[in-house]
From Swiss-Prot:
Lineage of the organism: Eukaryota, Metazoa, Chordata, Craniata, Vertebrata
Disulphide bond pairs: 94-103, 129-137, 283-404, 299-355, 373-392, 509-526, 515-557, 518-535, 529-541, 592-611
The IPT/TIG domain, residue ranges: 857-951, 953-1036, 1039-1138, 1141-1229
InterPro entries cross-referenced by the UniProt entry: Ig-like_fold (IPR013783), Ig_E-set (IPR014756), IPT_dom (IPR002909), Plexin (IPR031148), Plexin_cytoplasmic_RasGAP_dom (IPR013548), Plexin_RBD (IPR046800), Plexin_repeat (IPR002165), PSI (IPR016201)
Gene field: Plxna4
Tissue specificity field: Expressed in the developing nervous system. Widely expressed in both the central and peripheral nervous systems. Expressed in the peripheral ganglia, somatosensory, olfactory, visual, auditory and equilibrium systems.
Record: glycosylation sites: 654, 1006, 1131, 1179
Protein's UniProt name: Plexin-A4
CDD domains assigned to the protein according to its UniProt record, in alphabetical order: IPT_PCSR, IPT_plexin_repeat1, IPT_plexin_repeat2, IPT_plexin_repeat3, RasGAP_plexin_A, Sema_plexin_A4
Cellular compartment(s): Cell membrane
Phenotype when the gene is knocked out: No visible phenotype. Mice exhibit defasciculation of the facial branchiomotor nerve and of the ophthalmic branch of the trigeminus, with variable severity. In mice lacking both Plxna3 and Plxna4, migrating neurons do not show the normal response to Sema3A and Sema3F and do not migrate away from these semaphorins (in vitro).
Domain of life assignment: Eukaryota
Protein role: Coreceptor for SEMA3A. Necessary for signaling by class 3 semaphorins and subsequent remodeling of the cytoskeleton. Plays a role in axon guidance in the developing nervous system. Class 3 semaphorins bind to a complex composed of a neuropilin and a plexin. The plexin modulates the affinity of the complex for specific semaphorins, and its cytoplasmic domain is required for the activation of down-stream signaling events in the cytoplasm.
Domain called Sema: residue spans: 24-506
Length: 1893
């Protein structure tokens, strides 16, 4: 093995000092919660991200796979060993990698990403797979990471070139006595032909063994792997399967995957790509992958679908969760994290869910599906693996839990999704990883998130819900990667992000400070260690097994009560009794502590503890501001641990704080009020005498509630107050006073206590400032002895008032509150109290008086001042003295001489009247408003100064006059006097138009929605006037949006969007909207015409914490087009917001200094949005000062040609809706120069001129070169164009000429039919050359007689219908009786019954009838009958037709079939055929078409006949690009034109000799020493290689041993064409179902690959240089058409012959008519009248069972050789034939397979032929059984002795031997069999045949 090119270095003891954080906390001072916990972390090399993590369960060591390195770490994350894995020179396109053979791709230093890391415990090694060299793996020793092996030289060693660390998963399956297996599942990154997506490999004991990673099983057809077929990529170009997790359980290995799928959203016909999460299951022992099943998984909560798998982990259920789910504690559960939706794989949405799956339920679902599939229900449902739907086949099997599949019905997909149980959802911080375990029967999950947090979740939380009990930030920046692992003891958890590995304790109980917090946290690890007063695990609490020392439930927490629980601050050394609950025994003693006041010993008596309160010097002074009490914690401290273990609140109260009686006695403590001393005390004995003590609130001195106390200003008046318990002042105490606080000024008034319940403030007058307040509430306090307050609990106030304030008119005065006793004093004309109105001079009006009407009403304003004559206008009249009651004005209002009826609702006494106008006469035009108040006397009448006018309203026009049906159009109606009146109603037909505003010349209203498209008459009603005018508004269909472009913007919006739609011009102010995170942004649009508008994209509302470089999709995106609801949210758009461009500031100072003319560069990122479609630009404007500059944009910078400015200017960049100034630019002017500077510049200038001249000369030369290059490119383009045109022209010309040539060529050749025996053998036993039924029975002589006797007896039994039917049915019911066996038995029975065809037909009919019954019983679709050969009857039917249609073939159908075969062969051979891939220039099959231009010439060689040297030379047409073998075959075809194939010499046995003029002879060969080898490709020799000219003479001679140019013999044999065909057919992929790409496998010894005309394109070896000779390969598909046209006549002839009832005088074979009648009979019997079903039965029975076989395999009928290209073309014809017999419609599109498209136009007419054929047969007279039997007897007689019946019987008997008991069983039980003693006879046969008899 050649030395590896890596420079491996093993860095031992490479210790990194990491942030050391202790995980065990000291019990005394747990850290404060505010501190961020510090964890042990490890950070690798800055440039290398971490990928994978695995912990050795035995040693606890950690293995960390990173980019370019593998680390081995100790459990506290110290580096023990590192092993370097990269970088190295590589190119992902090098396959095989450059370490195996040289690679022509450019190499670059490439990182090695760790894709898989597994511990192989059995062999003590680490398997580490990387991304370099197509994904090779290393095996490293666990101890020191020493490299044990690194297999890289075989295909199997390349796992996949994919570069992502998270897309590969491996599972090791271990065996005790032989080598382990490794199941590997990987994404393939678009290279499915190189890498299987899932496979099982050998893990050999020896790490350097050759078989390491070899497939567990591999032969020509089957292997332990599955590849993604290349066809899948045509449907989904970026298809891949991403593997998220894998594990083994029971007999199975499981993988969880994410894969793209095309689905149609509900209600849509177009398909869109989504991602589906699936579980894949395989049997551990399955080598052929028949057990592959895949099931979609997902979960849903509250209507939200979570379908994108993020991570998963397998764990056990645990007892608590098990009970909830109904499973056993040790059943497997799968914990999974999904994110919302199905749309995006990489940028998942943040909403995510934790779901659990019960593995057993998934397995049960798979078992159900397997059972239904083996009943024949449904299809295999695996879109990516089977491009078309393959139906399930039924088979009688019992499928148990461990069923591992057969080669049928596999691989299988389950279409129905298995839904997980959602236990927890998170909407903001996406969950990205999960790990779980069971702790003390509780099931716990630990989930990592996008932001680097760890969520701890108790899945079996209280009430059956999951409980998230803790969240910790564990890595600095997220996301947390999928791989998480527990330490060996499960006490620590290792968590990593791309840059950091952290060790986190599984629990952090120490953070909880109290028993309640600890046990309320929900963490099942935590309990309360009582005497140590800490929260901890039970095992860490001392003596936790003793009673009451460890609390694990809330009710076990310690409780403490104290009696008494409060004392006054002035009480000392009081005895306190403490009662304790849940306390352990306290024999060691206990202390009582009053916080930091005092500490003393407690006396323990049972569960009571006695303590004393603190002494005088220790009691706190309770400060007044803090209220009347002070709470301290009374704590109990254990003397054993020195820790406080219980505490309760204890109160010191202070009564003296209270200074009012009510607050004192209402205090919760024992406070008393001393009434005469006015103090509060805890000791009632200190009150001066007994009556003075107050304990109850009702005994307190206090004022009682009174109604409003009204005091007019400036009036002298006493205030009397009610009270109770007023104390009598004692000697030496002062009397009572009232204190009023008026506008901040205290006014004290002496007061008089009448008795204990009454007090009066003395006569005084009061006043306050200003006339803005007409009454003022004033605080009132009653005191005695100067400052002893009397409590005022009702908070009585005194109201001071002024009558004149804010009541300027008589009406307003009389409206005032009657309690004020205000009235109107007329002579000064003001509002006063009565005593202030001079009585002799004037009248005083008051409301209650008889004369209470105000005179002189006045009108100040009327609204509106115009109205229609018709009336109905509501006129509002405002003024003074307009009556005090409604009845005063109810009938006395006239407006412009017209009655106006007042309305109660609008009346405000004295101030406002609203009345409704009556109709005016035509003569009335204008007038004043006149009113009378109550009576119409002059002093009670008023007239307005404004005039009211009657108007005539007219309408002129409306704009716009059409709008959408949904409404919302703002319509302007123009006219005159449109502001008259009070109320406007606009109607469009019956739809209201909502009034908006108006002026004299217009009314604006908004339309409402209409149900239909209509023209509506416009009516406007103003009050009672209907304005008539023929205006029409047209409701038009709502606008629609057809498409928008581009479908993206940036987050700040304001980029232009072009919108196309219909009826867009209806909308006046269209707007575009986007809603995100519940916030909506709107922007404007401008309509260009009915179908186009341009909009400015709305911004996207993003929160401040949004990550700026993510792509976003708005929740809603749409348009606000008036009221059109349907466009508010566009469903079919995928509008995307890319991150805003971000600019950097010029420098920290923000100033950039430049020379004039230097461009300004603005650096940034996201300057070009990463749109999928390619070149998109944003429109940038950059202003320097005021001047714009021209901008060039790249992704990370803007280049701005600085304008012609000097000095300092601000730079401003604008794009979309954002502006940014990176700073100022300072452009320095050029400075004047000194003399030396000028001299030196002159010198430099001279040199520069010389230099420039030199440059110009060089430039001239260079530009000439580039001109040439341009011309060359131009020529190449022209060349390509002309070649495409030529190709099309050529194809057309060929089509016209070839048809004629072919038809003339084919005449006259005899048809080499096979004889009857060979023909039947090839159909009955395909592929078996010398079958026993053709030979005599071979038995040893001594047994011959017995055996013959036994077989004769057996023949009698076979001829017994009851026995034969029973025999066949029994065999068919055996599970091990395979499809091949069924076919074999059917053929053997038919050979035995060849001489008794009547009986055979009878049995066949019986079996078919049974089959039809069974088919209909099992509810299969009736059309499936006879579709596939799954029973003996179906194969017998084929054989029956084979026997009976031989004559028809020979006389009739054989000729067109042979002609078609010859035509195809000739047509193919007219053009080049690749000897290795089998592709040809002319083909009907797209797969076998050479898609390149191959230059070739036709040569005519003269060939000497090998048989007769003297016969004339035969001219043979060949091509100069033919290989030598191809030439030999063409020569043989020409010379032995009429000789059957089997009688001709083989090309491989002949040599081709070129006889040159000089008599020299040269042997030509496919490979010899002259063969050209180039870059590992060896090209087969062609005629052109030897430069054989046209007209040369060649001869075929028998093979020579050597020749001068021969190559060693081992390779000579390789040159036969069939060998290459085999090579193509079977290499590269184990089974044509799984991948259809041939792969030319290089010889592993030499690494050389053969080619002929085209290199196999999978190898990508065509270099860039070959581009010139390539053309778009699809151009060549026109050749299919040319070939089809050429062969059309022959296809038509064949189909016409087969589908006509009378052809060239040959009648329809009786067998066909007889069988079709039988099928019709059966259909009638079962009541099937669907013509499609009958048609299908007939098609399945004859065309599909017989004719298709003959068309595809003409070698069954003729003695010919069929090569692979002819085979491919015949397959296309056969497919067309099948399509013609089908009744279903084929929908074709541009993606349909080419063979369907090729004959799409012809198939309908062929279908008509088939229908006509079937109906003609139906109309023919029925064949009587007599006639039929006579015909069958004749057939039997003709072919009586073709087969050896004895040998056939012996073959059949072998099945009796195999299933003797099963066959005898039914014979014993059946009555008929019993009567005929069939069981006994069979036993006789068995006895005779047995060996030992």
């Amino acid at each position: 093995m050649k030395a590896m090119p890596w420079n491996w270095t093993c860095l031992l003891s490479h210790l990194l000092v990491v942030g050391m954080g202790s995980s065990t906390l000291l019990p005394r001072q747990p850290p404060q919660l505010s501190q961020k916990p510090s964890f042990v972390t490890f950070r690798g090399e800055p440039a290398e991200g971490f990928n994978h993590l695995v912990v050795d369960e035995r040693t606890g060591h950690i293995y960390l796979g990173a980019v370019n390195r593998i680390y081995k770490l100790s459990s506290d994350l110290k580096v023990l060993v590192t092993h370097q894995t990269g970088p190295d020179e590589d190119n992902p396109k090098c396959y095989p990698p450059r370490i195996v053979q040289t690679c022509n791709e450019p190499l670059a230093s490439t990182n090695n990403v760790n894709k898989m890391l597994l511990i192989d415990y059995k062999e003590n090694r680490l398997i580490a797979c990387g991304s370099l060299y197509q994904g090779i793996c290393k095996l490293l020793r666990l101890e020191d990471l020493f490299k044990l092996g690194e297999p890289f030289h075989k295909k199997e060693h390349y796992l996949s070139g994919v570069n992502e660390s998270g897309s590969v998963f491996g599972v090791i399956v271990s065996y005790s006595n032989f080598d382990d297996k490794l199941f590997i599942a990987t994404a393939v990154d678009g290279k499915p032909e190189y890498f299987p997506t899932i496979s099982s490999r050998k893990l050999t004991k020896n790490s350097e063994a050759d078989g390491m990673f070899a497939y567990v099983f591999h032969d020509e057809f089957v292997a332990s792997m599955i590849k993604i077929p290349s066809d899948t990529f045509t449907v989904i170009p970026d298809f891949d399967i991403y593997y998220v997790y894998g594990f083994s359980s029971g007999n199975f290995v499981y993988f969880l995957t994410l894969q793209p799928e095309m689905v149609s959203p509900p209600g849509s016909t177009t398909k869109e790509q989504v991602y589906t999460s699936k579980l894949v299951r395989l049997c551990k022992e399955d080598t052929a992958f028949n057990s592959y099943v895949e099931v979609p998984i997902g979960c849903e909560r509250n209507g939200v679908e979570y379908r994108l798998l993020q991570a998963a982990y397998l764990s056990k259920a645990g007892a608590v969760l098990g009970r909830t789910l109904g499973v056993r504690p040790d059943d497997d559960l799968l914990f999974t994290v999904f994110s919302k939706g199905q749309k995006r794989k990489m940028k998942s949405l943040d909403e995510s869910a934790l779901c659990i799956f019960i593995l057993k339920q998934i397995n049960d679902r798979i078992k159900d599906r397997l059972q239904s599939c083996y009943r024949g229900e449904g299809t295999l449902d695996l879109a990516w693996l089977k491009v078309k739907d393959i139906p399930c086949s039924s088979a009688l099997l019992t499928i148990d839990d461990n069923f591992c599949g057969l080669d049928m019905n596999a691989p299988l997909g389950v279409s129905e999704m298995v839904r997980g149980i959602p236990v927890f959802t998170e909407d903001r911080d996406r969950m990205t990883s999960v790990i779980a375990y069971v702790y003390k029967n509780h099931s716990l999950a630990f989930v990592g998130t996008k932001s680097g947090k760890l969520k701890k979740i108790r899945v079996d939380g209280p009430k059956g819900n999951a409980l998230q009990y803790e969240t910790v930030q564990v890595v600095d920046s997220g996301p947390v990667l999928r791989d998480m692992a527990f330490s060996k003891d499960h006490e620590q958890l290792y968590i990593m992000s791309e840059r950091q590995l952290t060790r986190v304790p599984v629990e952090s109980c120490g953070q909880y400070r109290s028993c309640g917090e600890c046990l309320g946290s929900g963490d099942p690890h935590c309990g309360w260690c009582v005497l140590h007063n800490t929260c901890t695990r039970k095992e860490r609490c001392e003596r936790s097994r003793e009673p009451r020392r460890f609390a694990s439930e809330m009710k076990q927490c310690v409780r403490l009560t104290v009696h008494p629980n409060n004392i006054s601050v002035s009480q000392y050394n009081v005895l306190l009794v403490l009662e304790t609950y849940n306390v352990p025994e306290l024999s060691a003693g206990v202390n009582c502590t009053f916080e930091d006041l005092s500490e003393m010993d407690g006396l323990v008596i049972g569960n009571q503890i006695q303590c004393y309160s603190p002494a005088a010097k220790e009691v706190p002074r309770i400060i007044t501001e803090n209220g009347d009490h002070h709470v301290v914690q009374l704590q109990l401290k254990s003397k054993e641990t020195g820790m406080t273990f219980a505490s309760t609140s204890f109160v010191f109260y202070n009564c003296s704080v209270h200074n009012s009686c009510l607050s004192c006695v209402e205090s919760p403590y024992r406070c008393h009020w001393c009434k005469y001393r006015h103090v509060c005390t805890h000791d009632p004995n200190t009150c001066s005498f007994q009556e003075g003590r107050v304990k109850l609130p009702e005994d307190c001195p206090q004022l009682l509630r009174v109604d409003k106390i009204l005091v007019p200003v400036e009036v002298i008046k006493p205030i009397t107050l009610k009270a109770k318990n007023l104390p009598q002042p004692q000697s030496g105490q002062r009397g009572y006073e009232c204190i009023l606080n008026i506008q901040g000024i205290e006014q004290r008034v002496p007061a008089l206590r009448f008795n204990s319940s009454s007090v009066q403030c003395q006569n005084t007058s009061y006043s306050y400032e200003g006339m803005e307040i007409n009454n003022l509430p004033v605080e009132l306090t009653v005191v005695w002895n100067g400052h002893f307050n009397i409590d005022n609990p009702a908070q009585n106030k005194v109201y001071l008032y002024k009558c004149g304030a804010m009541r300027e008119s008589c009406g307003l005065c009389l409206k005032a509150d009657p309690d004020f006793e205000c009235g109107w004093c007329q002579s000064p004309g003001q509002c006063t109290l009565r005593q202030h109105c001079p009585a002799h001079e004037s009248r005083w009006l008051e409301l209650s008086g008889a004369n209470s009407k105000c005179t002189n009403p006045r009108i100040t304003e009327i609204i509106p001042v115009t109205g229609p004559r018709e009336g109905g206008t509501k006129v509002t009249i405002r003024g003074e003295n307009l009556g005090l009651e409604f009845r005063d004005i109810a009938s006395h209002v006239k407006v412009a001489g017209v009655e106006c009826s007042p309305l109660v609702d609008g009346y405000i006494p004295a101030e406002q009247i609203v009345c409704e106008m009556g109709e005016a006469k035509p003569s009335q035009h204008a007038g004043f408003v006149e009113i009378c108040v109550a009576v119409c006397r002059p002093e009670f009448m008023a007239r307005s100064s404004q005039l009211y006018y009657f108007m005539t309203l007219t309408l002129a026009d409306l704009k716009p006059n059409r709008g959408p049906m949904s409404g919302g159009t703002q319509v302007t109606i123009t006219g005159t006097n449109l502001n008259a009146g009070s109320n406007v109603v606009v109607m469009f037909g019956s739809q209201p138009c909502l009034f908006h505003r108006r002026s004299p010349s217009y009314i604006i209203c908004n339309t409402t929605s209409s149900e239909e498209v209509l023209d509506m008459k416009v009516t406007v009603q103003v009050d009672r006037a209907r304005i008539r005018q023929d205006l029409v508004f047209q409701y038009v269909e709502d606008p629609t949006i057809v498409r928008i472009e581009p479908e993206w913007s940036i987050v700040s919006g304001n980029t232009p969007i072009a919108v196309w739609g219909t009826h867009l011009d209806l909308i006046q102010n269209p707007q575009i909207r986007a809603k995100h995170g519940g916030k909506e942004h709107i922007n404007i649009c401008e309509v260009l015409n009915a179908t186009e508008m341009t909009c400015q994209a709305p911004a996207l509302a993003l929160g401040p914490d949004h990550q700026s470089d993510l792509t976003e999709r708005p929740e809603e995106f749409g348009f606000i087009l008036d009221n059109v609801q349907s466009l508010l949210i566009l469903n079919k758009t995928n509008f995307t917001y890319y991150p805003n461009p971000v600019f950097e500031a010029f420098s920290p100072s923000g100033i950039l200094e430049l020379k004039p003319g230097t461009p300004i560069i603005l650096k940034g990122k996201n300057l070009i949005p990463p749109v999928a479609g390619g070149n998109v630009k944003l429109n940038y404007t950059v202003l320097v000062g005021e001047k714009p500059c021209t901008v060039t944009v790249s992704d990370v910078q803007l280049l701005c040609e600085s304008p012609n400015l000097i000095g300092r200017h601000k730079v401003m960049a604008r794009v979309g809706g954002m502006e940014y100034s990176p700073g100022m630019v300072y452009i320095a002017p050029d400075s004047p120069l000194s003399l030396p500077a000028i001299v030196s510049i002159a010198v430099a200038g001279g040199l520069l001129i010389i230099f420039i001249v030199a440059v110009l000369i060089a430039y001239k030369r260079k530009s000439r070169e580039s001109d040439l290059t341009l011309k060359r490119l131009q020529m190449q383009m022209d060349n390509l164009e002309s070649r495409v045109a030529l190709e099309c022209k050529e194809a057309f010309a060929e089509l016209q000429t070839d048809i004629h040539e072919l038809t003339s060529d084919l005449d006259g050749a005899g048809i080499p039919f096979l004889d009857y025996r060979t023909y039947t053998m090839r159909v009955l036993f395909p592929g078996i050359e010398d079958h026993p039924v053709l030979r005599d029975l071979e038995v040893p002589g001594y047994r011959q007689e017995r055996v013959e006797k036994g077989l004769k007896l057996f023949a009698q039994l076979i001829n017994n219908k009851v026995f034969l039917l029973s025999f066949i049915r029994t065999l068919e019911s055996q599970r091990s009786f395979s499809m091949r066996d069924r076919g074999n038995v059917a053929s053997l029975i038919m050979t035995v019954l060849q001489s008794k065809l009547e009986y055979a037909t009878d049995v066949l009919k019986q079996l078919l009838a049974d089959l039809i019954d069974k088919n209909l019983e099992s509810k299969n679709h009736p059309k499936l009958l006879l579709r596939r050969t799954e029973s003996v009857a179906e194969k017998m039917l084929t054989n029956w037709f084979t026997f009976l249609l031989y004559k028809f073939l020979k006389e009739c159908a054989g000729e067109p079939l042979f002609s078609l075969f010859c035509a195809i062969k000739q047509q193919m051979e007219k053009g080049p055929i690749d000897a290795i891939t089998g592709e040809a220039r002319y083909s009907l099959s797209e797969d076998k078409l050479i898609r390149q231009q191959i230059e070739y010439k036709t040569l005519v060689l003269s060939c000497v006949s090998p048989d007769n040297v003297n016969s004339p030379e035969v001219p043979v047409k060949i091509l100069n690009c033919d290989t030598i073998t191809q030439v030999k075959e063409k020569i043989l075809d020409a010379i032995f034109k009429n000789v059957p194939c089997s009688h001709r010499p083989k090309a491989a046995d002949m040599d081709l000799e070129w006889r040159q003029g000089s008599g020299a002879r040269m042997i030509l060969q496919d490979e010899d020493i002259t063969t050209k080898i180039e870059n590992d490709w060896k090209r087969l020799n062609t005629v052109a290689h030897y430069q054989v000219p046209d007209g040369s003479v060649v001869a075929l001679v028998s093979k020579q041993v050597t020749a001068y140019n021969a190559v060693n013999n081992s390779t000579v044999s390789r040159t036969s064409a069939s060998k290459y065909e085999n090579m193509i057919r079977y290499t590269g992929s184990p089974d044509s179902l799984r991948s259809r790409t041939p792969m030319i496998t290089p010889d592993l010894e030499s690494g050389v690959k053969l080619w002929h005309l085209v290199k196999n394109h999978e190898h990508g070896d065509q270099k860039e240089g070959d581009r010139g000779s390539k053309m778009v390969s699809e151009i060549y598909l026109t050749r299919l058409l040319a070939t089809k046209g050429t062969l059309q006549k022959f296809v038509d002839d064949l189909f016409e012959t087969i589908f006509s009832t009378a052809h060239r005088g040959s009648a329809l074979p009786l067998a066909i008519k007889y069988m079709f009648d039988f099928l019709d009979e059966q259909a009638d019997k079962h009541g099937i009248h669907d013509p499609h079903v009958r048609h299908t039965w007939k098609s399945n029975c004859l065309p599909l069972r017989f004719w298709v076989n003959m068309i595809k395999n003409p070698q069954f009928v003729f003695d010919i050789h069929k090569n692979s290209i002819t085979d491919a073309c015949l397959s296309v014809v056969a497919q067309t034939f099948m399509d013609s017999c089908s009744t279903s419609e084929h929908r074709l599109g541009k993606d349909s397979p080419s063979n369907k498209l090729l004959y799409a136009k012809d198939i309908p007419s062929y279908k008509n032929w088939v229908e006509r054929y079937y109906s003609d047969i139906g109309k023919m007279p029925a064949i009587s059984d007599q006639d039929m039997n006579a015909y069958l007897a004749e057939q039997s007689r003709m072919h009586m002795n073709e087969f050896n019946t004895m040998s056939a019987l012996s073959e059949i008997f072998s099945y009796v031997g195999k299933y003797s008991e099963e066959i005898l069983g039914p014979l014993d039980h059946d009555d008929q069999c019993g009567k005929q003693k069939l069981a006994y006879k069979l036993e006789q046969v068995i006895t005779l045949m047995s060996l030992d008899s």
